[in-house]
Regions:
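N-terminal Rossmann NAD(P)H-binding glycine-rich loop of SDR-like oxidoreductase domains
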Residues: 10-32
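N-terminal Rossmann-fold cofactor-binding loop
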Residues: 39-44, 60-61
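Conserved Rossmann-fold cofactor-binding substructure of NAD(P)-dependent oxidoreductases
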Residues: 55-74
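N-terminal Rossmann-like NAD(P) cofactor-binding module of classical short-chain dehydrogenase/reductase
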Residues: 71, 75-78, 112
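NAD(P)-cofactor binding segment of oxidoreductase domains
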Residues: 84-111, 147
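Glycine/proline-rich active-site loop of Rossmann-fold NAD(P)-dependent oxidoreductases
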Residues: 121, 157, 173-178, 204-213
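Substrate-positioning beta->alpha
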Residues: 144, 190-202
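Conserved beta-loop-beta element that borders a ligand/cofactor-binding pocket
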Residues: 150-172
Length: 219
Protein backbone atom coordinates (compact mmCIF):
# COMPACT_ATOMS: atom_id res chain seq x y z
CA UNK A 1 0.00 0.00 0.00
CA UNK A 2 0.99 3.60 -0.43
CA UNK A 3 2.92 5.18 2.42
CA UNK A 4 0.93 8.37 1.94
CA UNK A 5 -2.79 7.51 2.11
CA UNK A 6 -5.08 9.65 0.01
CA UNK A 7 -8.00 11.28 1.76
CA UNK A 8 -11.12 10.58 -0.28
CA UNK A 9 -12.65 13.73 1.11
CA UNK A 10 -15.11 14.46 -1.69
CA UNK A 11 -16.48 10.96 -1.97
CA UNK A 12 -16.38 8.28 -4.61
CA UNK A 13 -18.69 7.52 -7.51
CA UNK A 14 -19.33 3.84 -8.25
CA UNK A 15 -20.42 3.18 -11.83
CA UNK A 16 -22.32 -0.10 -12.02
CA UNK A 17 -23.30 0.11 -8.36
CA UNK A 18 -26.38 -2.04 -8.90
CA UNK A 19 -24.44 -5.20 -9.74
CA UNK A 20 -23.20 -7.68 -7.17
CA UNK A 21 -19.61 -6.42 -7.16
CA UNK A 22 -20.77 -2.81 -7.26
CA UNK A 23 -22.98 -3.34 -4.25
CA UNK A 24 -20.12 -4.96 -2.35
CA UNK A 25 -17.92 -1.95 -3.13
CA UNK A 26 -20.62 0.47 -1.97
CA UNK A 27 -20.99 -1.48 1.28
CA UNK A 28 -17.24 -1.51 1.93
CA UNK A 29 -16.85 2.18 1.09
CA UNK A 30 -19.63 3.09 3.49
CA UNK A 31 -18.15 0.84 6.18
CA UNK A 32 -15.08 3.05 6.01
CA UNK A 33 -17.10 6.23 6.17
CA UNK A 34 -16.78 7.30 2.54
CA UNK A 35 -19.58 9.23 0.88
CA UNK A 36 -20.75 7.28 -2.18
CA UNK A 37 -22.62 8.19 -5.34
CA UNK A 38 -24.14 4.98 -6.70
CA UNK A 39 -24.49 5.38 -10.48
CA UNK A 40 -26.84 2.95 -12.23
CA UNK A 41 -28.77 2.75 -15.49
CA UNK A 42 -32.18 2.41 -13.81
CA UNK A 43 -32.48 3.86 -10.30
CA UNK A 44 -36.00 2.45 -9.93
CA UNK A 45 -34.54 -1.07 -9.91
CA UNK A 46 -32.00 -0.23 -7.22
CA UNK A 47 -33.83 2.05 -4.80
CA UNK A 48 -32.55 -0.03 -1.89
CA UNK A 49 -29.04 1.34 -2.52
CA UNK A 50 -30.00 4.84 -1.43
CA UNK A 51 -29.46 5.62 2.22
CA UNK A 52 -27.22 7.41 4.66
CA UNK A 53 -24.07 8.43 2.84
CA UNK A 54 -25.23 6.97 -0.49
CA UNK A 55 -26.77 9.05 -3.29
CA UNK A 56 -28.44 7.09 -6.08
CA UNK A 57 -28.24 8.58 -9.58
CA UNK A 58 -28.94 7.59 -13.16
CA UNK A 59 -25.98 7.48 -15.53
CA UNK A 60 -25.23 6.08 -18.97
CA UNK A 61 -21.60 5.09 -18.55
CA UNK A 62 -21.08 5.01 -22.33
CA UNK A 63 -21.86 8.75 -22.53
CA UNK A 64 -18.82 10.96 -21.71
CA UNK A 65 -21.01 13.94 -20.82
CA UNK A 66 -23.09 11.84 -18.42
CA UNK A 67 -19.93 10.43 -16.82
CA UNK A 68 -18.51 13.93 -16.41
CA UNK A 69 -21.69 15.29 -14.84
CA UNK A 70 -21.98 12.33 -12.47
CA UNK A 71 -18.31 12.35 -11.46
CA UNK A 72 -18.05 16.12 -10.94
CA UNK A 73 -17.02 16.97 -7.40
CA UNK A 74 -15.76 13.49 -6.50
CA UNK A 75 -12.24 12.46 -5.59
CA UNK A 76 -12.25 9.05 -7.28
CA UNK A 77 -14.31 6.63 -9.34
CA UNK A 78 -14.91 2.89 -9.48
CA UNK A 79 -16.18 0.98 -12.51
CA UNK A 80 -17.90 -2.39 -12.06
CA UNK A 81 -20.18 -2.05 -15.06
CA UNK A 82 -21.83 -4.85 -17.03
CA UNK A 83 -24.69 -5.22 -19.47
CA UNK A 84 -25.99 -8.24 -21.40
CA UNK A 85 -27.83 -5.98 -23.84
CA UNK A 86 -24.87 -4.77 -25.94
CA UNK A 87 -22.01 -6.79 -27.51
CA UNK A 88 -19.17 -6.81 -24.98
CA UNK A 89 -16.52 -5.37 -27.28
CA UNK A 90 -18.82 -2.48 -28.15
CA UNK A 91 -19.90 -1.89 -24.55
CA UNK A 92 -16.55 -2.08 -22.80
CA UNK A 93 -14.77 -0.11 -25.51
CA UNK A 94 -17.39 2.65 -25.29
CA UNK A 95 -17.34 2.55 -21.51
CA UNK A 96 -13.58 2.93 -21.31
CA UNK A 97 -13.63 5.81 -23.78
CA UNK A 98 -16.43 7.56 -21.86
CA UNK A 99 -14.68 7.10 -18.52
CA UNK A 100 -11.39 8.46 -19.84
CA UNK A 101 -13.07 11.49 -21.42
CA UNK A 102 -15.68 12.10 -18.74
CA UNK A 103 -13.37 11.76 -15.76
CA UNK A 104 -10.91 14.04 -17.50
CA UNK A 105 -13.58 16.69 -17.92
CA UNK A 106 -14.62 16.30 -14.28
CA UNK A 107 -10.97 16.39 -13.16
CA UNK A 108 -11.31 13.11 -11.32
CA UNK A 109 -7.84 11.59 -11.41
CA UNK A 110 -8.28 8.17 -9.79
CA UNK A 111 -10.16 5.28 -11.42
CA UNK A 112 -10.37 1.74 -10.07
CA UNK A 113 -11.79 -0.61 -12.68
CA UNK A 114 -12.75 -4.20 -11.84
CA UNK A 115 -11.52 -6.60 -14.52
CA UNK A 116 -12.06 -10.30 -15.26
CA UNK A 117 -9.72 -13.22 -14.62
CA UNK A 118 -9.70 -14.39 -18.22
CA UNK A 119 -7.65 -11.34 -19.26
CA UNK A 120 -4.79 -12.31 -16.92
CA UNK A 121 -1.66 -13.87 -18.37
CA UNK A 122 -0.74 -17.54 -18.16
CA UNK A 123 2.57 -16.77 -19.88
CA UNK A 124 4.13 -13.49 -21.07
CA UNK A 125 1.80 -12.02 -23.68
CA UNK A 126 -0.71 -14.89 -23.44
CA UNK A 127 -4.03 -14.37 -21.68
CA UNK A 128 -6.34 -17.06 -20.37
CA UNK A 129 -8.74 -16.34 -23.24
CA UNK A 130 -5.97 -17.02 -25.80
CA UNK A 131 -6.06 -20.74 -25.03
CA UNK A 132 -7.59 -22.59 -28.02
CA UNK A 133 -9.68 -24.57 -25.53
CA UNK A 134 -11.19 -21.43 -24.02
CA UNK A 135 -15.01 -21.58 -24.32
CA UNK A 136 -16.14 -19.57 -27.31
CA UNK A 137 -19.27 -18.46 -25.47
CA UNK A 138 -17.17 -16.38 -23.07
CA UNK A 139 -14.52 -15.10 -25.47
CA UNK A 140 -16.30 -11.91 -26.53
CA UNK A 141 -16.89 -10.89 -22.91
CA UNK A 142 -13.22 -11.35 -22.08
CA UNK A 143 -12.08 -9.57 -25.24
CA UNK A 144 -14.34 -6.65 -24.32
CA UNK A 145 -12.53 -6.30 -21.00
CA UNK A 146 -9.18 -6.61 -22.78
CA UNK A 147 -10.20 -3.80 -25.13
CA UNK A 148 -11.12 -1.60 -22.16
CA UNK A 149 -7.69 -2.28 -20.67
CA UNK A 150 -6.04 -1.27 -23.94
CA UNK A 151 -8.03 1.98 -24.00
CA UNK A 152 -6.94 2.77 -20.44
CA UNK A 153 -3.31 2.12 -21.36
CA UNK A 154 -3.68 4.57 -24.24
CA UNK A 155 -5.20 7.26 -22.02
CA UNK A 156 -3.55 10.49 -20.97
CA UNK A 157 -1.13 10.11 -18.08
CA UNK A 158 -3.28 12.43 -15.95
CA UNK A 159 -5.71 9.54 -15.33
CA UNK A 160 -4.34 7.39 -12.51
CA UNK A 161 -6.13 4.11 -13.19
CA UNK A 162 -5.76 0.56 -11.95
CA UNK A 163 -7.56 -2.57 -13.08
CA UNK A 164 -8.16 -4.86 -10.10
CA UNK A 165 -8.69 -8.40 -11.39
CA UNK A 166 -10.13 -11.22 -9.26
CA UNK A 167 -9.67 -14.96 -9.92
CA UNK A 168 -12.20 -17.07 -11.79
CA UNK A 169 -13.78 -18.16 -8.52
CA UNK A 170 -15.31 -14.99 -7.11
CA UNK A 171 -17.13 -16.37 -4.07
CA UNK A 172 -20.15 -14.17 -3.46
CA UNK A 173 -21.34 -16.11 -0.40
CA UNK A 174 -18.07 -16.42 1.52
CA UNK A 175 -17.54 -14.11 4.49
CA UNK A 176 -14.79 -11.56 4.02
CA UNK A 177 -11.49 -11.94 5.84
CA UNK A 178 -10.17 -8.43 5.18
CA UNK A 179 -7.05 -10.00 3.67
CA UNK A 180 -5.90 -10.60 0.11
CA UNK A 181 -2.76 -10.96 -2.01
CA UNK A 182 -1.81 -8.82 -4.98
CA UNK A 183 0.35 -9.54 -7.99
CA UNK A 184 1.02 -8.39 -11.51
CA UNK A 185 -1.18 -9.13 -14.53
CA UNK A 186 -0.64 -12.88 -14.22
CA UNK A 187 -2.98 -15.53 -12.82
CA UNK A 188 -2.36 -15.35 -9.08
CA UNK A 189 -4.76 -17.72 -7.33
CA UNK A 190 -8.00 -19.60 -7.69
CA UNK A 191 -10.39 -17.80 -5.39
CA UNK A 192 -11.34 -14.66 -3.50
CA UNK A 193 -14.40 -13.72 -1.49
CA UNK A 194 -16.40 -10.94 -3.12
CA UNK A 195 -16.20 -8.99 0.14
CA UNK A 196 -12.40 -9.15 0.00
CA UNK A 197 -12.39 -8.01 -3.62
CA UNK A 198 -14.33 -4.98 -2.41
CA UNK A 199 -11.71 -4.40 0.29
CA UNK A 200 -8.99 -4.45 -2.38
CA UNK A 201 -10.92 -1.97 -4.53
CA UNK A 202 -11.51 0.48 -1.70
CA UNK A 203 -7.89 0.16 -0.55
CA UNK A 204 -6.87 1.39 -4.01
CA UNK A 205 -9.11 4.41 -3.46
CA UNK A 206 -7.95 5.36 0.02
CA UNK A 207 -4.29 4.36 -0.27
CA UNK A 208 -3.40 3.93 -3.95
CA UNK A 209 -0.57 1.42 -4.34
CA UNK A 210 -0.76 0.64 -8.06
CA UNK A 211 -0.80 3.10 -10.92
CA UNK A 212 -1.75 2.73 -14.59
CA UNK A 213 -1.50 -1.06 -14.50
CA UNK A 214 -3.51 -4.24 -14.21
CA UNK A 215 -3.12 -6.23 -11.01
CA UNK A 216 -4.43 -9.59 -9.85
CA UNK A 217 -5.91 -10.16 -6.40
CA UNK A 218 -6.59 -13.48 -4.66
CA UNK A 219 -7.01 -14.93 -1.19
Amino acid sequence: MSSTPRQVDRGVVVFGAGGQVGRAVVTEARRRGLAVTAAVRDPERHRDLAGEGVSLVRCDVTDPAAVAATAHGHTAAVSTVYTPDVPSTDFYGATADALVAGLGTARVRRLVHVGVATTLETAPGTAVHDDPAFPEAYRAFSLGHALALDRLRESDAALDWVVVTPPLDLDRAAPGTGRYRTGGPQVLGERIAQADLAVAVVDELTAPAHHREQIAVAE
